[in-house]
């Protein structure tokens, strides 16, 4: 169990259960997103920085007429830019246990850099830098090997609404948030498709 998993476990224990911890995390996000006194979640309109987590509305994808379903409220771990579009892993599409495994592994790998940025920025989401090496090209082998690549999506910057960036210091809260808004399907259908792919490719 890595550092992030331990922090999440502590939150669950403190809340006396996973369901309550998830509910409290959603309440935390909504309160923080609308607060001017807490900079751990801030408005953000620029291109995504690799390694940072963003939450936004995505109501009308350019290719929506050809999509079976899509998430209108993605929670995205950015992989940087690709062909002028934002690219990242939509954490909403990954079943909870697998999501924790993914975030824990990434946090452990970049822990030194993340901790330095949190201390330097004092938990201010906008001032924290990204992780330059956390790009699709660099992590593609890992994503393909584990199956997490099935949750990678691209987003047109101009179609994003109400975009917010979350501080690394709050990844423990983000891991507990369920903010999906699936159009054209249910979250269980999304979990089924993504979950099977991850299980199939897990080694």
Task: Pin down the residues of each PLM region.
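Short linear interaction motif-like sites in intrinsically disordered regions of transcription factors
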Residues: 29, 70-71, 172
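Intrinsically disordered, low-complexity, charged/polar segments
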Residues: 94-203
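Mixed-charge, Lys/Arg-rich low-complexity intrinsically disordered regions
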Residues: 2-54
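Short, solvent-exposed secondary-structure boundary/capping segments
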Residues: 84-93
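Short aromatic-glycine-(Arg/Gly/Cys) micro-motifs in beta-strand/loop hairpins
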Residues: 48-50, 63-66
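Short beta-strand-centered aromatic/proline hotspots
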Residues: 64-83
